[in-house]
A protein has these predicted regions:
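N-terminal strand-loop-strand
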Residues: 1-39, 67, 99
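Unchanged
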Residues: 44-69, 77-107
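Residue-level detector of high-confidence beta-strand sites
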Residues: 24, 73-76
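Short, charge-rich amphipathic segments
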Residues: 28-32, 76, 80-81
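Intrinsically disordered regions, especially transient/low-confidence alpha-helical propensity segments
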Residues: 34-35, 44, 72
Length: 107
């Protein structure tokens, strides 16, 4: 049986000063046969958490990139996906942000 989790989420389109977009290469940790994918950083929002604050927190947790200038929410969407044995129904708030760039190797 698959559980459904419905949650608000905040995500970030992160651009460096050269206009490059930062993407995360992801895979499902419990389904090795599922194809991998590229995504923008982000995740679930805390109770009463502002979407900009949540986007910045998730960006830092997932990438560790310093000195980020967070911009406004530029898009709102509803998504559904399966990940790690759960079915997610997510209300996403997409923010834009900028960083100085550089070579990053988040783990």
């Amino acid at each position: 049986m698959t559980f459904t989790l419905r949650r608000p989420a905040a995500r970030v389109v992160l651009l460096d000063r050269a206009g490059r977009i930062f993407l995360i290469h992801a895979e499902d940790p419990i389904d090795p046969h599922k194809p991998d994918w590229w995504e923008i950083p982000g995740g679930g929002m805390g109770w009463n958490e502002d979407s900009g604050a949540a986007a910045l927190r998730e960006l830092h947790e997932e990438t560790g990139i310093p000195n980020v200038e967070m911009g406004p929410c530029v898009w709102v969407q509803q998504t559904e996906y399966d990940f790690a044995g759960y079915h997610f129904e997510s209300d996403d708030r997409i923010h834009v942000a900028w960083c100085d760039g550089g070579d990053y190797d988040p783990q």
